[in-house]
Amino acid sequence: MKAMERWFNVGKIVNTHGIRGEVRVISRTDFPEERYKKGNKLYIFRERDTEPIEVTVKSHRVHKSFDLLSFEGYDSINDVERFKGAMLKVPESQLGELAEGEYYFHEIIGCTVVTEGGETIGAVKEILTPGANDVWVVRREDGSEALIPYIDEVVLHVDPERKTIIIRPMEGLLE
């Protein structure tokens, strides 16, 4: 592992689940079914450790609003208890390529949103995933928030390198 590797959060272990080594995870990944696939490598970062702990996903299932994961070689609650509160991360090299028009959350958060007329709306601070399409929460300069749906009719251009997004606001969107 390269010392200068960039790491990306994919989840937070908030508790154990049952007695067979499952952990309850609040997912922070755009692609949980891909990221938590059996056989995938994840890295556990605990505050007091200097090096991450590499684990291999043994199983993944969704229960209520949590992702439940188990790892190879960690078969009881006693094995995973110490992971409570830890972050699950992957190195940048593990992110993989996306199709055109798809972006990782970290590429969108922090982008400046501008209308096609050149008016600056604000910066994306959060991404909501309520259903059919993502919704970007944009912090305006006056501190208020605008909700921008990630749909073709509204989002005209995304430039992650320049950290800019150009939109065509629908009537009433920015009021």
From Swiss-Prot:
User: SUPFAM superfamilies attached here?
Assistant: PRC-barrel domain, Translation proteins
Q: Does the keyword Chaperone apply?
A: yes
Please give the chief subcellular localization of this protein: cytoplasm
Instruction: Give residue ranges for domain PRC barrel.
Output: 100-173
GO cellular component assignments: cytoplasm; ribosome
Q: Which GO terms describe its biological process?
A: ribosomal small subunit biogenesis; rRNA processing
User: Which Gene Ontology molecular function entries are recorded, alphabetically?
Assistant: ribosome binding
Q: Which UniProt keywords apply?
A: Chaperone, Cytoplasm, Ribosome biogenesis, rRNA processing
The family annotation for this protein states: Belongs to the RimM family.
The cross-references to HAMAP family, in alphabetical order and at most eight, read: Ribosome_mat_RimM
Domain writeup: The PRC barrel domain binds ribosomal protein uS19.
Assembly and oligomerization: Binds ribosomal protein uS19.
Query: What protein name does the entry list?
Result: Ribosome maturation factor RimM
The protein's organism comes out as Geobacillus kaustophilus (strain HTA426)
Species lineage: Bacteria, Bacillati, Bacillota, Bacilli, Bacillales
